[in-house]
Amino acid sequence: MSVQVQFRVNGKSYQSHVEPRLLLAHYLRDTLGLTGTHIGCETSICGACTVLLDGKAVKACTVLAVQASGSEVTTIEGLAATASPNGGLHPVQEGFWEKHGLQCGFCTPGMILASVELLGKSPNPTEMEIRQALSGNLCRCTGYQHIVEAVQHAAKEMKNRKPKSKNPNNSSAKR
């Protein structure tokens, strides 16, 4: 038995017939070839398989492809394209690069996508908010401090990149 699913993955539409119990992580990796969605524990503990599902960070090893049908999925492969059509990195990816927020890289895609969700909700998070938001993503290498610094760096970059208001009635404008 197969079920039809349809998604927008990294801005591109896909339609497939899948087995009803196929996990989103396996659909992304095996059907679409998007291997940046890592498989670590397959029990929702490590967070290596984190993707954005309609903008919310989810662990793709616990979401069935049929549950995600009709949704917009963003993987690590598509993140830069959403931020910079000319091939540049997303500010969170830049932060991980600049602040050495990765070592072996296995947890990195999940950490980055969980961080993107956090910064979408809280553009200026505290260190504790960052640690809490990433508590479902495990890293065996970095000790987390560089990851926290990477997210803080990204928050500053994202704030600096926002266009300034051109409204002359803006109360913060000099008079």
Q: Locations of the language-model features?
A:
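Signature of N-terminal electron-transfer/Fe-S-associated modules in redox systems
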Residues: M1-K166, A173-R175
